[in-house]
Amino acid sequence: MTQTWLTVDCDDFRHIPKHYGHPTRSKSPILSQELSPEFKLGMRGFEHWLSTHENPVTLFVIADSLENQEFCLWLKGIITEYSNRITIGCHGLTHKSWSAWPEDVEQFSQSITQAMEQISGFAGENFRPWFRAPAGYMAPWMVAPLVDCGITVDSSINDSILTRVKAGGGNTWQQVRDTCQQVGLLEREWLTKWRLPVNGPALSLFPLS
């Protein structure tokens, strides 16, 4: 029987590559740490959705989001209300598109270590050492440092014709996949069909929309 893993990335507008973390795409930074109206609407919608079913859900949290008190109160409330169904994974210290930048194992390792400490300290028993690369930018060189930092499951591979560049310059998703297998990192890939995404932000783009 096929099982579906329900996951949500907790990105606000200030986190996305258009505004942050990408060497060429980030043109207009959003300096405010306040939650956007759209994100707040999503928080309320997510909470309502949780009340309509009994399925477990994983939230991938960016550590810098924990600097916002409103988000922290909301997330703590979700964990308290649905503690047996909610798990919290790591979506990075910030939302930096790591594979779009030159390889920097030391800085990447430091950022993941800090993120794990901050997120696990907040989420407690609901934290899991699971990782999803910010904006899906995941290169082969990032795999071994993740394992060294204690990550046991990765969910970054989105093997779509629209996301090939996110594996890093000259790399392929198969190389990321092979590296995960070599070091024993369990990979849970994004669902695709006909090499196109069936979920995620790409569904807002024509013709998938």
Residue ranges, per PLM feature:
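Alpha-helical packing segments of well-folded alpha/beta enzyme cores
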Residues: F39-W49, S111-I119, M142
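Metal-dependent polysaccharide deacetylase catalytic core of the NodB/CE4 family, i.e.
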Residues: N55-A139, I157, T192-W194
